[in-house]
Every structure is written in C-alpha cells, then in structure tokens.
C-alpha cells in the first residue's frame, strides 16, 4: 500500500483527529503520529508498517471522577474507591496493575486533566516494591498518598519497603489498596494479607462490599493512618471490586499540603529512619502509643458495625468482606430478608486488624456461642476471639473452622452449610424457617439436560484466539520431538497457559520475572540445557536484574525465551517500558534486546514475528545446540492479539461503513485434503480450530475445521508447514467495498477456475456404478 493510500485510510478511520503527520523512517517503517497517541512501531523488535495505540480508553469512567457534592456515582466498587481517593485529598497515587485492582490504575492513567486540576501526582510503578517505596513521601511530610497492587503476590514483592515504612511510621495518611485475590476467581497462590498486616503492624481494613461503606473506609483509612502514624491496608476481594452500586459523591479535594511544598521545604526526623537506636524506639512506639491510638480511633468512629437484634443466644462475627455472602446464606435459612434485616445479632469487622477487645466482649456477653466467619487459613481472628473471651472469663463458645472450610472461598452455599451446622448445635430453634426452594429434579432429569455433560466438553483455560504466544510453544514442541524433553521453568503471565494441554510445557513458576532465576540451580555440565520462559512485563518488573543479570553474572548456559507482546497483556493491556505505542505520559519503546545486551548478554536473537513457526523452531534449536557458553536469550515479539483486535476492529468497521475498500483475511481447511489425523490441533490448540464430521466414506475420522472466530493470524497454516503436516490449510482474502479492478479480477478467476473444472470433468473416467 502506498503512503498516500495509508494517509487517506487513517485520516478516514482515526476518530477525533484533525492533524495527521506521515513519514517514512530510516527503516522503511510507516510513521503515523496524531493527537490520539498513535505512532509507528519502531524497529525495537516488531514488524514494519504496523501501528499500535497506548492502553484502552477509560474516558467514560474518568467523567465519573468529576462528580461533585450531591451527585450520584454509579459503578463498580473499585471505581468508587478511586473516586474516594480524590475526595480524601490524596496527593499522589502509584501502584502496579493486576486483578482485581487494575481498573483503579487504568482510570487514573486516563484522568490526566482531573489529576492536574487537583495537583495529584500519578504514576504506574515499575513494581509493587517501587509503589510501596513511593509511600516514603508521607513519612516526613503531612502528605496523603495511596498505592495499590494485587495481593498476596504484590505484597510479597513490596515486603521490604512496607516493613521499613511501618517501622518508622508516617506523618501523612498512607493507604495501601490491596486486591485480595482469593477464591474461585483467583490467579495466584491462596494466602491472606492478614498475616503480613500482623507481622508488620499495619492496620487492615476489610470493608463491607457496598459502595457507601467502601468510600467511607477510604476516607476513614487516611484519618486512621494520620491519627496513629501507621500505614493502613484496605483489603478488597474480587467480588468487592466488581460489585455494582451507588453512593452520593462529594467534591474532590486538593491536597492540603502539596508535594511541591515538601520539595521546597525539606525536613527530616532521624527518629523515623530505621537505624539503631531509633529502630528499637520505633518497636516500642508501635505497642505503647500507636496500638492504643488505633483502638480508640476505631471505637470513636464506629468503624465496626452491628446489625440485627441487640440480644440473642447466638451471634455471628464476620470480616466485612464476608457480609454479603453471610446475609445471603441467612436469607436462604429464613433468618434475614432481602433488605438486610437479620434476626441473628451480627458484628461486622470492617477493621480486621487490630481487633477491639471491648467491642468483641460486649457482643459476646450473654451468648451461648458465636460463629466466626473468617475466609482463608490460618484462623487468626478465631484464635484471638478465644484469647479475648478467656482472659475476660466469658464462657461464650467460639465456632468457626469446625463448621466452615479451612480453605476456599466462602460462597453463599458454603456459608449456608456452615451456618446450618452451627445453629443445629447451638440454637436449633432458629432452624425450620427456610423458604421453599424450587425443585430442580424435573429439570435435571430431562434427557436434553443430561446430554449437556457429553456435548459440552470441559475446556481448560488457554491462549486467546490468534495469540502470538501459541506459535512459540508449538515451535517448542517441535524442538522437543527432535531433541528430547528439557527442564522448562515457567513464569507469571499469559504464557503460563503453556503448562496446560495441548502443550504441557513448564515445570515450575516461582514469581513474576523469576522464570530464568528459577532455573539457576541447573547451571551444571549436562548434555541438555534448561529452558526458561519470561514475559516482557515480568522482564521489566523483576527479570532484568534478578534473572538476566544473575544469569550473565554467573555464566549460566541455559536458554531464556522472553515473550514480548508489547503490553502487560495479562493484567489488561497496560503499557510497559518496551511498548511500541507513543505514550505522551511515559517513555516507551525501550528495547528489550538493548537492555539484555547492556547487562552483558552476548548470544541474543530476536524474532520479529512469532507466527513464523519455522524460524522460531530453528532459533530454539540453535540456542539449545550452540557451542557458545553463557546465557542464550531469545526475544520473541508480536503484538497481543486481544489488544490488536481492540485497536483494529473499530477502525475496520468504520472504514467499511464509510465505503472504503477494506481487506481482511480468514483461514480455512480444505475438506478434500484434510486427513483427519488432527496433528495440527495438537500442535496449535487454537479455540477456533475444531473438528467436524464429513460425509466422505473414505475417511473414518472427523476432519479439522476453522470456525467464524478466526482472526486470520495464520498460525495453523504455519504450524502445518513447519511440522510437515498435510497441506490442507488455505488463506482467503475478503475484500469489503471492492473496487472495479477487484470485481474484474474475481470474475476472471472464476472463469479460469470454471475452465479447469470443465477440463477435469471432460477427462474423468466414469464407471457404470457411478451415479454421475
């Protein structure tokens, strides 16, 4: 396509852009710059002539951040928390993206005008450790700051900075919004933030999952932090982050003390620096002053809540985050209504740590038993309850993990089972009021319903359709068939799906950016080399020093594969230092290849198109068989297909609607050629590549088929060619709004094809039994 045609196409398809500037760089790559932040892909490792945009737009959510006094905010819990930060007079916000708190970062990244008006500094931190260290701005100055990340993985990374922060204490409010990634929707190890909060004496809030409470706890969290000179964690679970609701907004507040004022009036207090003898004094201060101050604040501001009747023979104590599931279970048991009115006394811990002994004792006094609803293990609070009650000589029995699971998410059915068992032991008179439930037996007995278990097979998680990481592991499987199995260390990211069928690649995963580091022990003389996989996000997060630097320094001889998809794809498509897009707020286009060479690696290869399976295979083979010592590093680059589709589909649709000639590609399988051995499926695993039955009597097995979800990446055909499979794949070019030339070419092709078919039929041998 000529430059003039490209210019015309993008002027027609890029929205809200009046000024486009086009040019050709020294590498013959198309350059497109405009007000929307679109730029050509530099030769830092990607294909020529393609364009990429910075992260997805959250313009609508940004408008919600501008709501003022009396206006009603409607949306998700995590967005309500974001709004609450601005209402609280926060001065700076940092963090590292990850479910379930990514939206907080995403929205603020697009809210430049709002933040500038308020004088709020925002940045995407390089890691959770960086984010935690950012809170040091609140140590010496009365500045309110907030950071966020996914826990517990993120908290582990941030541990060093958090320990120092909590030891010296803070002057300004320091709030840490923790996405408690626990339960059925989790993607990490199942641990609790509670343990870390206790270890470092950081106050832990666990608010009820409704928007007014979330907003209030953000505001009170800053106050609690300042009143006790202690950082505060605000723990929000997956379902809390995504719960929908509304609250009455307030005006956003400008910081009462700005970062600029701090810079222009520096101060220091050596007693807040973690260095003996101050560190000993800080430990004493934690227990003698900060703890009592926190207890008094929690009581005075009524941060914990009570619901239901004042008196009762039994009661339920729960973490705030467990409130919704507990209420639904009580409703199923006929002990609460749909409006939250409970006939059982409830004590809700919106502050999970520290506990207020007086409140707990007052709630438990006169009750036969209480049930402690505490998701996850160990049962820290249940143990504390027993200690509090025994010290006060209260004989109330404490139940908890004896009727509820030690681990796993406390969903409503789980809670219902545990509550029923608790009440059957301690208050049987409360049972028997369950409302009638629909009888599902008739539905489940329907043969059509039973058949669903056979016609809908289980489908494990895997790569998206067209994912550029799929051909990497297809190539790895081919090399494995040729050179034998190798020890492969995996890493955190989309590429971790390689451990599942059909690839079954990867033995361990130790942490973000630690794939190569986890293969360190295998740096021994052997006929085989270890292979490590790491993503571009993990590379910049922790991998450059901890993995690549370590491998270079210790002269490792293994192979490291860096998957470069241009984004932090697994967390929502955020930009990272090596992203190809022009980002007006950050410095992107930093080459991974230059970085690994800069740290001392010498055997470095880059593949600009991962869909070239043959090249991927040959490069992997070369790395595994090279005579050169030292780490072998392969950077495999192609844009995340999910982000690419988000970017190109609106432009494509707009071009078609405008009547422009627009071309797309699809792939298919020639039914006459396909042998039905399905090797292509085993080496690809693409969800759009499936099977279908054929009427050909000479074929016993169903043939391969590509459905309408195909995005035209070409991986199936590349795999078939590289692995020398049957040549049954074909590529179809679909032209929307074809030109006169397109129509003439199509007409001519059809005539030529018809002539060949006629010629073939004329020479066909017809037997008597042939109905033709």
Regions found by a protein language model. Name each.
Residues 660-670, 723-772:
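Intrinsic disorder at enzyme termini
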Residues 115-124, 167-178, 262, 553-564, ...:
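A glycine-rich helix N-cap at a beta->alpha junction
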Residues 33-35, 45-210, 239, 309-313, 499-633, 641-646, ...:
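Thiamine diphosphate
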Residues 181-231, 237, 265-274, 278, ...:
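Conserved thiamine diphosphate
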Residues 104-107, 134-137, 157-161, 184-192, ...:
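Short acidic, glycine/serine/threonine-rich loops at helix termini
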Residues 25-35, 46-78, 82, 208-469, ...:
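Flexible, low-complexity linker and terminal segments
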């Amino acid at each position: 396509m000529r430059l003039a045609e490209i210019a015309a196409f993008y002027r027609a398809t890029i929205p809200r852009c009046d000024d486009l500037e086009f040019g050709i760089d020294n590498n013959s790559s198309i350059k497109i710059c405009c007000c929307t932040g679109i730029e050509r892909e530099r030769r830092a490792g990607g294909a020529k002539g393609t364009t990429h945009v910075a992260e997805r737009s959250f313009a609508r959510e940004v408008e919600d951040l501008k709501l003022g006094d009396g206006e009603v905010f409607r949306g998700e819990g995590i967005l309500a928390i974001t709004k609450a930060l601005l209402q609280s007079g926060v001065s700076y916000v940092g963090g590292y993206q990850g479910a379930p708190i990514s939206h907080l970062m995403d929205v603020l990244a697009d809210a430049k005008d709002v933040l500038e008006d308020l004088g709020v500094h925002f940045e995407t931190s390089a890691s959770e450790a960086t984010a935690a260290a950012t809170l040091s701005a609140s140590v010496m100055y009365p500045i309110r700051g907030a950071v966020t990340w996914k826990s517990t993985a993120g908290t582990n990374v941030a541990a060093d900075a958090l320990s120092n922060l909590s030891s010296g204490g803070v002057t300004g409010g320091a709030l840490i919004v923790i996405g408690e990634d626990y339960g059925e929707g989790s993607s990490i190890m199942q641990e609790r933030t509670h343990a870390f909060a206790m270890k470092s004496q950081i106050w832990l809030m666990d608010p009820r999952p409704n928007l007014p409470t979330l907003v209030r706890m953000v505001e009170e969290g800053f106050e609690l932090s300042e009143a006790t000179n202690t950082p505060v964690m605000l723990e929000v679970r997956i379902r809390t982050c995504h719960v929908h609701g509304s609250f009455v907004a307030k005006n956003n507040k400008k910081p009462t003390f700005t970062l600029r004022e701090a810079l222009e009036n520096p101060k220091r207090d050596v007693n807040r620096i973690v260095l003996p003898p101050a560190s000993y004094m800080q430990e004493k201060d934690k227990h003698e002053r900060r703890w009592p101050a926190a207890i008094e604040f929690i009581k005075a501001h009524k941060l914990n809540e009570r619901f239901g009747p004042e008196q009762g023979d039994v009661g339920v104590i729960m973490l705030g985050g467990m409130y919704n599931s507990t209420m639904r279970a009580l409703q199923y048991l006929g002990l609460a209504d749909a409006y939250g009115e409970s006939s059982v006394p409830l004590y809700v811990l919106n502050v999970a740590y520290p506990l207020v002994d007086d409140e707990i004792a007052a709630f438990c006094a006169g009750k036969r038993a209480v049930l402690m609803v505490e998701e996850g293990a160990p049962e820290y609070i249940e143990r504390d309850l027993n200690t509090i009650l025994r010290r006060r000589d209260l004989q109330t029995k404490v139940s908890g993990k004896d009727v509820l699971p030690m681990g796993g998410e406390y969903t409503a059915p789980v809670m219902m089972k545990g509550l029923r068992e608790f009440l059957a032991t301690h208050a049987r008179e409360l049972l028997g009021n369950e409302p009638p439930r629909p009888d599902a037996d008739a539905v489940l007995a329907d043969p059509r319903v039973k058949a669903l278990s056979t016609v809908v097979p289980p489908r494990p998680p895997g790569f998206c359709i067209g994912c550029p990481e799929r051909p990497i592991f297809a190539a790895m499987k081919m090399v494995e068939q040729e050179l034998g199995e190798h020890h492969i260390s995996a890493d955190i990211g989309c590429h971790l799906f390689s451990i599942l069928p059909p690839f079954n690649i990867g033995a361990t995963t130790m942490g973000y950016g630690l794939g190569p580091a986890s293969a360190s022990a295998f740096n021994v003389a052997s006929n085989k080399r270890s292979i490590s996989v790491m993503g571009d996000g993990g590379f910049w997060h922790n991998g450059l020093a901890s993995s690549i630097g370590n491998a270079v320094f210790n002269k490792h001889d293994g192979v490291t594969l860096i998957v470069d998809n241009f984004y932090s794809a697994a967390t929502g498509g955020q930009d990272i230092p090596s992203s190809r897009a022009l980002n007006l707020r950050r410095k992107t286009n930093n080459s991974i290849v230059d970085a690994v060479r800069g740290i001392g690696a010498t055997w470095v290869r880059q593949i600009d198109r991962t869909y070239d399976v043959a090249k991927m295979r040959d490069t992997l083979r070369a790395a595994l068989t090279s005579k050169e010592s030292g780490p072998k590093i392969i950077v495999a680059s192609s844009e995340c297909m999910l982000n690419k589709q988000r970017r190109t589909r609106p432009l494509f649709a707009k071009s078609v609607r405008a009547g422009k000639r627009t071309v797309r590609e699809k792939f298919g399988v020639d039914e006459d050629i396909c042998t039905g051995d399905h090797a292509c499926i085993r080496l690809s695993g693409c969800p759009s590549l499936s099977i279908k039955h054929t009427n050909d009597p000479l074929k016993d097995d169903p043939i391969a088929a590509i459905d309408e979800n195909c995005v035209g990446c070409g991986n199936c055909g590349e795999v078939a060619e590289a692995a020398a499979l049957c040549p049954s794949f074909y590529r179809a070019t679909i032209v929307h709004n074809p030109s006169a030339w397109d129509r003439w070419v199509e007409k001519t092709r059809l005539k030529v094809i018809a002539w060949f078919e006629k010629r073939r039929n004329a020479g066909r041998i017809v037997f008597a039994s042939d109905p033709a």
